[in-house]
């Protein structure tokens, strides 16, 4: 096993999306089930959630395709008390990523808002927040 390589920023973003998008899709599905049983007229809400889930599904497909093109494969995911650990191969090198629960929740909420068509302009990117160039 080779471990000295560090995945590029784009590679890390792909892996992060690969981990987050299935959770977002599960949340949309769970919310659809809850809304369909607790609202008198759930159809409009379910339509919005369905549209959001369809876009997220397309994004996940695109992420997987891009990962294949770039030689990235997640081979292990573990749910830890602190977050989600992923082990992946990036162009022949073994990498590890840990997403803390707070980060996962915050990022998932921002992505969900975007998929639902809500304004996310008040949320700064990591680069903007820490003034990274």
Model-inferred region functions:
Residues 1-2, 6-8, 36, 43-45, ...:
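Short, well-ordered helical secondary-structure segments
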Residues 1-41:
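Long, hydrophobic N-terminal alpha-helical segment
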Residues 48-50, 55-133:
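Low-complexity intrinsically disordered segments
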Residues 35-55:
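Short, flexible N-terminal segments of the mature chain
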């Amino acid at each position: 096993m080779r471990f000295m390589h560090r995945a590029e920023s784009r590679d890390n973003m792909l892996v992060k999306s690969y981990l987050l998008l299935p959770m977002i899709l599960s949340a949309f599905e769970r919310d659809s089930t809850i809304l369909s049983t607790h609202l008198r007229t759930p159809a409009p809400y379910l339509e919005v959630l369905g549209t959001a889930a369809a876009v997220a599904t397309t994004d996940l497909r695109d992420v997987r395709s891009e990962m294949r093109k770039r030689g990235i494969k997640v081979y292990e995911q573990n749910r830890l008390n602190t977050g989600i650990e992923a082990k992946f191969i990036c162009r022949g090198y073994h990498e590890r990523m840990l997403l803390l629960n707070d980060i996962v929740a915050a990022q998932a909420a921002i992505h969900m808002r975007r998929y639902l068509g809500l304004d996310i302009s008040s949320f700064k990117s990591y680069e903007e927040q820490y003034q990274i160039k």
